[in-house]
Swiss-Prot record:
One Pfam family from the record: RnaseA
Top-level lineage group: Eukaryota
Residues annotated with Pyrrolidone carboxylic acid modification: Q1
Name recorded for this polypeptide: Sialic acid-binding lectin
CDD domains: RNase_A_canonical
Organism: Rana japonica (Japanese reddish frog)
Amino acid sequence: QNWAKFQEKHIPNTSNINCNTIMDKSIYIVGGQCKERNTFIISSATTVKAICSGASTNRNVLSTTRFQLNTCIRSATAPRPCPYNSRTETNVICVKCENRLPVHFAGIGRC
């Protein structure tokens, strides 16, 4: 995965996330199945990108900034469109950095 895909998957252009709508996009369908969960970072790409600015090697980095997060969690195994629940929180995030760019969302609260 690269920075462009990371942005597409995790940095929406809106703060108003409707999990049932957004998670039906093809990027969240894996092998014909709905993705179990996905976390959206409600922030600018520039702010998220800054997490990796000091990462000289390819590794996981914990942000010093707390981000507003919206996690969509599949609530049932059903045919598309799959039903999702939404969980919002504010916390630090862990991302995998490659070439000083976030490429993978690794976790919430710790690395």
